[in-house]
Regions:
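Extracytoplasmic metal-acquisition and chelation regions
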Residues: 1-140
Length: 140
């Protein structure tokens, strides 16, 4: 029971950080490789724009890329997120074309071998995700 309560407290701390992030962030829009973060965005009043829709394997059209690059520039988005288990190639291309940089936002779909070797778990990965969101949305 103590372990459950301790873990619940850590989850509440993550939720509190995300709530504070949403309240403090001057930028609410973030760009991701694919639309894996809709629930997070909706729950915390943020706006996700995905390069490739739902599937991480889909290829955007040239028109999609042009519109996305315009959105990034118009909204002064400083970072384009990519995922740990997906090639960062398209995110890097979009970032370069728009003057942004890339960061990792992990959808927690699986652990890489490096992640397993580092002892990563849900709490550690979400903490890194929040750190990166704070940076991307102008809180840090």
């Amino acid at each position: 029971k103590k372990n459950i309560e301790a873990y619940q407290e850590k989850l509440l701390q993550l939720d509190q950080r995300l709530t504070e992030l949403s309240a403090k962030a001057p930028q609410k829009l973030f760009v991701t490789t694919h639309a894996a973060f809709g629930h997070l965005a909706e729950d915390y009043g943020l706006q996700q724009v995905a390069i490739m829709g739902i599937s991480p394997d889909a290829e955007p059209t040239p028109a999609d890329l042009k519109n996305l690059i315009s959105t990034i520039k118009d909204n002064q988005v400083k970072y384009v997120f990519f995922e740990t288990l997906v090639s960062p190639r398209i995110a890097q291309t979009v970032a370069e074309a728009s003057g942004a940089e890339t960061l990792v936002l992990d959808p927690l779909e699986g652990l890489s071998e490096a992640g397993r070797n580092n002892g990563d778990d849900y709490l550690k990965i979400m903490t890194r995700n929040i750190d990166n969101l704070e940076l991307a949305l102008g809180v840090k």
